[in-house]
């Protein structure tokens, strides 16, 4: 069943590659670009087609199979998705291309390119299109369109959807996937129109809207959003990424006119408070660097919204910011957006629960015989869920420190190494304080950071389990 489903997923990627083909046709690009795209499509059709010839008798997917499908799908899609860049000679290194598209599908936005203008329009579009596909999840997308989305596919969706608790918004899983994607695409379309009306060229509007929707961060120009020189666009992008950093289940509540459930959500309130407080502190701390408070606030709001939602759209160099402001951004890198959103990171809900666990622990010392319960949104969080979150945090911290230790062999700059690892593992994007690329790192570090991006997007376990002997043993 694993081989059969992976083959179908490779065929889906082949179909998706027809989108950049149409862009190449529109812009009348070189034959080399068409050869690169069709060669990749041919490889995917050959591999995918050979794998679906024999349909498995047992189509049930268990937890182990679900995890393997998710992990292998993301790795394979990233590998094959990078081939057009290699074949076209625009990113000659296979490792660099794998890094670039891993960054795309995981909506990280980290790049090895020093100059994005080397990319043709079609591959520039494909690069950002991977943000749109990966934003809600490659498998959620596949589940929304596949004809055999049975309840057993719950294990696939649970392994991919970010957050400590997975919940279906409606009874049928396929309907859940379709509703989530319809909401997602509706908001994406809205921002394409908004950006176009704000003065962006149509091509740019699509590229930036895809980066906004997926909270990715790939742009059309080397200087990122600063290229447009518009405060209106800066604010619109900031608001846009914050919109996509919210749990999509809450938007479904709004559709059902459950306004109280939307605004009463504890994670949403904590998310907005963190954004406002961080923006306020940085605005005041960097006030002396800008002509007035309005510009200081604009820059602070842009950076905070982009970092907490793990988007990473570039806007100039902030290395001249005070260390206090840079450490706030580093702190936000660890938090991330909401569970069930397109944002990466540890997630606000986990931070909220961890803070409540710490509070209860302190209270239990003061009152040893007092029975303490933990509530989020008036729902009791049982001990099992609390322990799972604590275990996740421990594993997350151990991997993060290990990555920093290994990648530090490439650089003596603590802030660069730390922020690079935070950026990749939390799917944020650029190295803190600069819009420069990840080309400074060695091939080994790039491979490591590529897997860190995929692991971070899938919340660690699926990639971690690939390296366990028991995962590959027969049932």
Predicted feature residues:
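Membrane-proximal intracellular helices of multi-pass ion channels
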Residues: 1-475
